[in-house]
């Protein structure tokens, strides 16, 4: 397009527009170039260019399609051309000789009736697909789609531009076909994988465990001979009773059970008689009785000879010990099982990192693959066992708190908190972000991280909407500091609770007060280094949205309306009609957005100069909508949080966190007098709950495949290789980083439970003689801070991402990884240095 006067200089008097056309079989060449002129004096279409009339009418199948509307005040002096998926007339002129274009032609006749009408091509926003994000639409509007008066080029350059547009159209066509092929391959591959896992899982039956009751004493032992299977590589022996994972250091003075597994080795060519190989397994008894504990151990099957199991007891106070024993053969070695588990875990992370499927579906696929692997090796669990693997306490906590937050949000309290936070920060964005992160870290030290994320995420989202900030960046920073603050106390994070609850560690002096004092000092140093690092990582990132708040809110409103329409299943005629009305609403909002995108151009500074004026406007707009309901919500939520504290310090309260959250949700549902319960259920993040359920099954299946046990054993071997004078420092470094990396990849709860007996055995080994408390502090720091490494490394990360996605601000795995992983590395480095100074230099053991 170019604007020229009769003297050849660019002007607004004559407007020439060229439309690139695709080739057609009946025409020669790749396309035709048509010029339409608009006289600025009388606004009548006229022939522009001497060769315009000789080129004939335009061909069908334009490479770039446009919809033509009159120019008015909403659009300004812009001319926009954009591809769409609808046919349109290629040429409009009152003097056109083409019989295909008349006054009755759609989109043309109504505009040509009035003499003073001027027409421009405008992109039709209703043809935006669901896969095309609105974040990129404004850049395309303002950049590649505007035809301005600065493009004064010759006819030769116009032909070059036409060829480039045709090449671009071909490239887009090929990319579209490639995307279709990739989509087809993805669906086909995943379907074949699921079918294969289902077949493998169904081919091998559930063997079940036959538990045999036996009684052992110092005078009587129990012996049994087992016939070996041809395809067996391992023998797994399970014992159940009043057992403990590890015993005190004085092994000879404590009651224990000794298990001997003996088998004849396969005879070699030079041996006439097979050699007997005996494996010993010592299990310590709980002197107080305690609860029923199941312990397992695998032994290598050396040959097809029968296996002999002998169990005897070393007792002092009791006369006889009742036990339950079961055994089963496995068809894969430890190394093969660990390899299978690592491949499954890597596959799950590939699905999540590259967003091939939703993270919930990725966890479900990983669980199915792990269950199929267990079935193949001969350890297929029953449905009852799989359900028992799910941590229902965590799910109950999530569900109850989601109900509380859903009702709480109806009061307008989150909007009020957002305005107050803006007022306290006096319009300074970074002061507000640091204040939010610090409050989240302090609260998570005394509350569960999941509870803190559930309470803070809606407030942060509303605050960012008020200030025209990108909520994703603020939410990621906030949840990172939530995980850091949770490591400060013994009740802030589940790994800390597991460590403090261990009876053997309590006997060593690792109680609640000592653990909290030691960890709190280390986390303070971590916070001092984390805040400057956060500012450094966000140095070149614009936290403000690139567009005005009106445009951002309108785009978000379109996204929410579209999601609402997609979630309505057309099961009845009324629901189909409602879905149609919602889609019409989406189209009307997209048209409104298209008009507003051409009338706004604003640069936003990093500090709001008019924050006092904005505060007055925001206080009028965002108020408490229901004070009665707010009073009820604050009362119930305060009581729930008080019970959380009471549960940690008062042993007489026989309610765990899940029960407290569920009871609080029931109380608030009664007080709020909720009639339409389905509205509240729609606010629950069911995808997040399913993700946690699938993740619990996946982690437990990987534990049955000996992945976590293998990591612990390799960690112990690595520590033993270090010289004795440097062993404590090496042990702290190894435990911190192994725990951090493992916790960023797998759930930190089973990893912590597995590493505690491994580290206790290291501390009791006379060849190593390491103090246990420094190892436990290193384990706690690594397990808690390692959750910041990936999106699924901590429960709070997943909860925050789920709530943000429900509000239309979901962030991907890589978006979290770009900030979370550097923060994890630096925080673990600072925590490691603190432990080295405290325990190696100062000797605080």
UniProtKB/Swiss-Prot annotation:
Q: Which reaction does it catalyse?
A: chloride(in) = chloride(out)
Q: Which residues cross the membrane?
A: 184-204, 338-358, 361-381, 394-414, 430-450, 514-534, 630-650, 652-672, 688-708, 731-751, 774-794, 821-841
Note down the stretches annotated as region Disordered: 1-57
Q: Name one GO molecular function term.
A: chloride channel activity
In what way does this protein cross or attach to the membrane? Multi-pass membrane protein
Instruction: Kindly report every residue range on the membrane side named Extracellular.
Output: 1-183, 359-360, 415-429, 535-629, 673-687, 752-773, 842-845
* Gene Ontology, cellular component aspect: melanosome membrane
What family does this chain come from, according to its entry? Belongs to the CitM (TC 2.A.11) transporter family.
Outline what the protein does. Answer: Contributes to a melanosome-specific anion (chloride) current that modulates melanosomal pH for optimal tyrosinase activity required for melanogenesis and the melanosome maturation. One of the components of the mammalian pigmentary system. May serve as a key control point at which ethnic skin color variation is determined. Major determinant of brown and/or blue eye color. Seems to regulate the post-translational processing of tyrosinase, which catalyzes the limiting reaction in melanin synthesis.
Q: Which PANTHER family match?
A: P PROTEIN
Name of the protein: P protein
